[in-house]
């Protein structure tokens, strides 16, 4: 399920560097994390939805690549973001 614009704007203002900052790594990782958690909840109910499972795996891979890049560029901000989002630092 896609994020509605209000929820997306809330995430952008919380994690972005500016008001309309949608391209920074922090915002992209936060948006992907929200989409991943929504899809995970969906798959708990619909266990045989393999198309959504494939989409979930693609999102996780995309987030992993972004996190690897962000960790390499700004380690302190990366650790803060990981703690704030409540995700593991296994990259």
Curated annotation (Swiss-Prot):
<dbReference type="Pfam" id="PF00312">
    <property type="entry name" value="Ribosomal_S15"/>
</dbReference>
<comment type="subunit">
    <text>Part of the 30S ribosomal subunit. Forms a bridge to the 50S subunit in the 70S ribosome, contacting the 23S rRNA.</text>
</comment>
<dbReference type="InterPro" id="IPR005290">
    <property type="entry name" value="Ribosomal_uS15_bac-type"/>
</dbReference>
<comment type="function">
    <text>One of the primary rRNA binding proteins, it binds directly to 16S rRNA where it helps nucleate assembly of the platform of the 30S subunit by binding and bridging several RNA helices of the 16S rRNA.</text>
</comment>
<dbReference type="InterPro" id="IPR000589">
    <property type="entry name" value="Ribosomal_uS15"/>
</dbReference>
<dbReference type="InterPro" id="IPR009068">
    <property type="entry name" value="uS15_NS1_RNA-bd_sf"/>
</dbReference>
<comment type="similarity">
    <text>Belongs to the universal ribosomal protein uS15 family.</text>
</comment>
<protein>
    <recommendedName>
        <fullName>Small ribosomal subunit protein uS15</fullName>
    </recommendedName>
</protein>
<dbReference type="GO" id="GO:0022627">
    <property type="term" value="C:cytosolic small ribosomal subunit"/>
</dbReference>
<dbReference type="GO" id="GO:0019843">
    <property type="term" value="F:rRNA binding"/>
</dbReference>
<keyword id="KW-0699">rRNA-binding</keyword>
<dbReference type="GO" id="GO:0006412">
    <property type="term" value="P:translation"/>
</dbReference>
<dbReference type="GO" id="GO:0003735">
    <property type="term" value="F:structural constituent of ribosome"/>
</dbReference>
<keyword id="KW-0687">Ribonucleoprotein</keyword>
<comment type="function">
    <text>Forms an intersubunit bridge (bridge B4) with the 23S rRNA of the 50S subunit in the ribosome.</text>
</comment>
<keyword id="KW-0694">RNA-binding</keyword>
<keyword id="KW-0689">Ribosomal protein</keyword>
């Amino acid at each position: 399920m896609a994020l509605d614009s209000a929820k997306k704007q809330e995430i952008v203002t919380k994690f972005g560097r500016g008001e309309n900052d949608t391209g920074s790594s922090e915002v992209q990782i936060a948006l992907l994390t929200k989409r991943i958690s929504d899809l995970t909840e969906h798959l708990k109910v619909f266990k045989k939805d393999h198309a959504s499972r494939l989409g979930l795996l693609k999102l996780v891979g995309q987030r992993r690549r972004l996190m690897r890049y962000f960790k390499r560029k700004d380690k302190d901000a990366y650790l803060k973001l990981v703690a704030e989002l409540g995700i593991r630092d296994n990259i």
